[in-house]
């Protein structure tokens, strides 16, 4: 099975006066394949490990700041 790419293909026949123009579009399964390829690149190998570490550090700081703000207002002296 051949994968089809989006685009226009123009073919001119020498033996007759017919010209052939064919147009193809990317199917949804090929779009999913593109997203899967990007996901595979970002989530595996050294880049994937770096992304997970950065995501974990960012999540830690978000939770830390939310906890700090919440604790400030809960334990605020009246």
Curated annotation (Swiss-Prot):
Residues in compartment: Extracellular: 70-78
Cellular component annotations (GO), alphabetically ordered: cell surface; plasma membrane
Main location (coarse class): membrane
Keyword Membrane assigned: yes
Modified positions (N-acetylmethionine) in chain numbering: 1
GO molecular function, one term: protein homodimerization activity
Phosphoserine sites (modified residues): 6, 17, 22, 27
Stretches in topological domain Cytoplasmic: 1-48
Subcellular location, record wording: Cell membrane
Membrane topology (UniProt): Single-pass type II membrane protein
Top-level taxon of the source organism: Eukaryota
Biased composition (Basic and acidic residues): 11-21
Region: Disordered, residue numbers: 1-22
Keywords: Acetylation, Cell membrane, Disulfide bond, Membrane, Phosphoprotein, Signal-anchor, Transmembrane, Transmembrane helix
Function comment: Regulator of red blood cell formation.
Quaternary structure and interacting proteins, as annotated: Homooligomer; disulfide-linked.
Membership in a protein family: Belongs to the SMIM1 family.
The protein, known as: Small integral membrane protein 1
Lineage: Eukaryota, Metazoa, Chordata, Craniata, Vertebrata
């Amino acid at each position: 099975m051949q994968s089809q790419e989006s685009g226009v293909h123009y073919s001119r026949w020498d033996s007759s006066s017919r010209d052939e123009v064919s147009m193809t579009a990317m199917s949804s399964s090929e779009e999913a394949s593109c997203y899967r390829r990007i996901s595979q690149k970002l989530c595996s190998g050294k880049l994937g490990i770096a992304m997970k570490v950065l995501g974990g550090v960012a999540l830690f700081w978000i939770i830390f700041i939310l906890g700090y703000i919440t604790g400030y207002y809960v334990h605020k002296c009246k």
